[in-house]
Amino acid sequence: MGIIDEAKRGQITDEMRAISKLEGIPVEKVRNRISEGKIMLIRNAKYPSRKLVPIGKGLTTKVNVNIGTSSEVVDLDMELQKVKVANKWGDTLMDLSTGGDLDAIRRDIIKASDLPVGTVPVYQIFIESFKKKSGGAYFTEDELLNTVEKHLKDGVAFMTIHAGITKDLAIRALKSDRIIPIVSRGGDMIAGWMIHNNSENPYRKNWDYVLEMFKEYDAVISLGDALRPGATGDAHDEFQIGELLETARLVKNALQKGVQVMVEGPGHVPLNEIAWDVKLMKKLTGGVPYYVLGPLPIDVGAPYDHIASAIGAAISSASGVDLLCYLTPAEHLGLPTVKQVEEGAIAYRVAAHAGDVVKLGRKARKWDDEVSYYRGKLDWENMISKLIDPQRAYQVYTQFGTPKVKACTMCGGYCPMMWAMDQVRKIGSSSSL
């Protein structure tokens, strides 16, 4: 029995109690929202990760870190270093490898990760088909489904399943005047398969069986947005919305079967459209968790897309997004280094908390208030220890040596907090004030 079925039966399990304690909300709310599909636990029940990662309504915004080899760069040691970065800064991890021994790489990443690991199974079968049959779209439906099952057996906790795109939507998008017809790698693979085989989406055709597989492991289906906008000029066109409508139907069906499900979102979206993108998705899907790639509010930001997208991510988080998929400085340019993975993850930790201050209010802001209290007291040790990155903060604080006065090296002896404390002492010692 999966966690949704347990919640629907009114059961309160140890996992629900753990979520309640972690997030600081009543366990009855946790149970009720799980039963409605508004909270879920990212896990593979047969191979639990070392970190508990719930996402959804009323919970803190979580951050996903993408790693993985490419056809151009296969360096497993580097990817395992990225896993260490993800363990420190992230909540979930996706292996998007497309080069090397994909089975071995995936298993090594799962073994090294403290976090729930996700994959995009169509990558593997497309690449294997390309190598063995001289064409990526030559795989069979059974081969795709067997790949999904293999990933579940390996302990994968969530998978991007591009089931929302139909053959009609794919053909019309490719013939359209979109700036970039299809930007999703997995979505393009499914579109290519449908066109080559003159057949409907293999995930949709076998949807009941897909649900059965995920139900067995109580793992999470992450419904991919194959037609997400790859340019801000394509945002919220008929193809993105058309796929979302199809996805919403699949969501309802999955929840009816007791299968955990979330929806993936864009992508490239102008700043003024981000909040209502979230509201639209939540409305159409009944409030299931939303997993969003930023979004990027501009298209010209590379190699600073981690900064540009963090702006969009803060707005999307504040508007109700539950899981943020990070971007790195290498986005749109190449495979990221370990350092670039860290830069992206930290940017998204900042964005997630900025959103939570709006979304969760006082519960999230307590952290900021504590830091500000110590800052006002010039209590550097306690203030620095509470920051997002204490180690880096201390390096910056001491980069010109230890300050000669209690203040930092920016204001020195003219620090307003230092002067304010001095004035308070004078006021307290004066009988005339």
From Swiss-Prot:
[4Fe-4S] cluster binds at C408, C411, C415. Keywords: 4Fe-4S, Iron, Iron-sulfur, Lyase, Metal-binding, S-adenosyl-L-methionine, Thiamine biosynthesis, Zinc. The keyword 4Fe-4S applies. One of its GO terms (biological process) is thiamine biosynthetic process. NCBIfam families: PRK13352.1, thiC. Catalyzes the synthesis of the hydroxymethylpyrimidine phosphate (HMP-P) moiety of thiamine from aminoimidazole ribotide (AIR) in a radical S-adenosyl-L-methionine (SAM)-dependent reaction. This is Phosphomethylpyrimidine synthase. The lineage of its organism: Archaea, Thermoproteota, Thermoprotei, Sulfolobales, Sulfolobaceae. The gene is thiC.
